[in-house]
């Protein structure tokens, strides 16, 4: 009997997330069949890689949150890294990010830029206290 298609098969998700919220959201997408590409910084990647190290320095948390994903290292502080990200986003369906509010805008990657690049892109922004309001800059 053929395996039924997963509900998110055919969707491309780009994850700009660290620790829990962003990686958890994209992991669910991956489990439901989406292609997920996790973008990590060159300064050690997602800190989750180092949480509760087990055998040979690996992290159970990392293995749980990173499964079924591809991973790519990009330095978004450099134009070349931002250009590669833009190429990935040009045909992506979903962007999941959990930076503090304003980080993507400071990098020149705010919603206005990304929407002009790919009008059908869905952007999921996860932060501890939302994107606006008096507590927006508080860590989550």
Model-derived features: positions:
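N-terminal helix-loop segment corresponding to the beta1-alpha1 unit
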Residues: 1-140
């Amino acid at each position: 009997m053929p395996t039924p298609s997963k509900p998110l098969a055919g969707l491309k998700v780009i994850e700009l997330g660290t620790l829990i919220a962003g990686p958890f959201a994209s992991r669910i997408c991956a489990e439901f069949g989406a292609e997920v590409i996790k973008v990590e910084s060159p300064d050690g990647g997602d800190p989750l890689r180092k949480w509760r190290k087990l055998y040979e320095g690996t992290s159970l948390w990392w293995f749980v949150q990173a499964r079924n994903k591809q991973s790519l290292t990009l330095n978004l502080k450099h134009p070349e890294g931002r250009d590669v990200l833009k190429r990935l986003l040009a045909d992506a369906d979903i962007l999941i990010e959990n930076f503090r509010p304003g980080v993507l805008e400071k990098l020149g990657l705010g919603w206005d830029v990304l929407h002009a690049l790919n009008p059908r892109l869905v952007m999921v922004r996860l932060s501890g206290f939302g994107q606006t309001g008096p507590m927006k800059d508080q860590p989550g």
